[in-house]
Amino acid sequence: MSLKKSPFFELRSGSVDTLLFIVKTADLDALRAELVKRFEATPEFFADDVVAIDVRRLADHERVPLDDIRGMLNDVRMRVIGVVAQPEQHAWAASAGLPLLEARDRRAPSSKAADEAPVQQAEPAAPAAGQAALFEQAGPTLADAGAPPESPAPAVAAQSATLVVDRPLHSGQQIYAKGDLVVLGPVSYGAEVIAEGNIHIYAPLRGRALAGVHGNHDARIFCTCLEPELISIAGIYRTTENPLPADVLGKSVQIRLEQEKLMIEPLRLT
């Protein structure tokens, strides 16, 4: 077989970042009701986004009809690209005809016992323990296509450089940072800033901010004027479906995770 490089196409190993729809119950009625509840107030948030169905939190004896779950997600305009499962779940998970993907999230999904553990009261955030399902940002890895890169990839630095954006972000614009992200202009409604590390916004945040998207639970969001459509850390998110308290709305804040809850706290700058 000739190893000559084709001018028309290449096959290479690669990975794709996507949302995980984490199934935590085999009760389809409860799952459907929770999904409708989440989307009826904010139907456009995940419209046309790709998603993988994650069944790793189901008990060993539990099975779910993946075709039905795919239909539910299609109904809210999400595009299912595959399934994430434990090795012992592969046989039945593959029966739906969806590709089996490997998630590269830093923290493995917690067990049901961990889901049911008591947590301290905090600002309402989605998802909370005990809910039927949640979305997380992760990196399912596509199957090896069989063609290696032309040359070895350089070693990745232990920490990615900070990305600084010194302009306003308008509706439809998206910024992604491999490390921390600093934004010096307003993030308008419909704009989105995403970082694997922390996010600092020295202007109004009116769009979406997603920090720690590969499962970094230590990531934080800092903002000088909080008026967001959505905030998220390590896949745990909150929308303005639940109005923000007066002491943080439009104020300087930091947002962090504490025991799987989003904590939104005023910043004392003086």
Swiss-Prot record:
Do you know which Gene3D superfamilies this protein is assigned to?
Answer: 2.160.20.70, 3.30.70.260
Q: Where is the composition biased (Low complexity)?
A: 116-129
Q: Which GO terms describe its biological process?
A: cell morphogenesis; division septum assembly; regulation of cell division; regulation of cell septum assembly
Which UniProt keyword terms apply here? Cell cycle, Cell division, Septation
Q: Which SUPFAM superfamilies match?
A: Cell-division inhibitor MinC, C-terminal domain
> What's the short name of a Pfam family annotated to this entry?
MinC_N
Q: Where is this region: Disordered?
A: 105-129
Keyword Cytoplasm, does the record have it? Answer: no
Taxonomic superkingdom: Bacteria
Q: What is this protein's function?
A: Cell division inhibitor that blocks the formation of polar Z ring septums. Rapidly oscillates between the poles of the cell to destabilize FtsZ filaments that have formed before they mature into polar Z rings. Prevents FtsZ polymerization.
Q: Subunit arrangement? A: Interacts with MinD and FtsZ.
- Family membership: Belongs to the MinC family.
Q: What is the name of this protein?
A: Probable septum site-determining protein MinC
Q: Which organism is it from?
A: Burkholderia mallei (strain ATCC 23344)
The opening ranks of the lineage are: Bacteria, Pseudomonadati, Pseudomonadota, Betaproteobacteria, Burkholderiales
Q: Which gene encodes it?
A: minC
